[in-house]
Amino acid sequence: MIDSAAMKAELLRAIYAWDRLRFALWRRRFGARLEVGAAVSPNLRFTDLRVESGARFVVGPGYATERRRGNHVWVQSGGALALGPRVWLRTECGPNYVTVAEGARIELGARCLINGAMLHANIGIRMGDDSMIGFGSRVLDSDFHHLDIRTPERSSPVTIGERVWIASDVTVLQGVTIGDDVVIGARAVVTRDVPSGVLALGHPARPVRSLGPRARLPE
């Protein structure tokens, strides 16, 4: 009698071994520009990845993503993208777009979740541990263009604290600091700093109520 469970387990082991081999070969293309920690999902190789000369992409241990081509990452010359332990670039709701301009830096803390969002840094974006960005949201540290002949393009780093939840279709603009334990409601536009421990809503986003600590939320 054929042991179907054993056959399935053997097939899964073979698929996993093949994935690891292909992942190792894929990593070699980037050399020292790509640094990968332990227990990183081999699905990383499905990333549409460009890491230019002099740039670095550091992937912390336990990185996760799905087995699809939903992540688009471009680290330009002299730029750096650093993902902390157990970061999840989730693609089930849509693609993620992460762009690091020349000399800029994006840093995501431990256990951050990016779910179908866009991050673009001309100078820098930093997210603290256990923070999340929802589907269709954007974090931009620059205007990208001159407003007029008298108003040049402006860039200023963005800082997002720990245990922050940025909901769907939110825009976070340059120079903003968001404190710890904050929730930014859907479709908000964040143009100014948000203090810790609040729910912020609207255009522009303003605190509407205080929140308790988010450190002990259920899994």
Show which residues each predicted segment covers.
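Glycine-rich NAD(P)-binding loop of Rossmann-like domains
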Residues: P152-G161
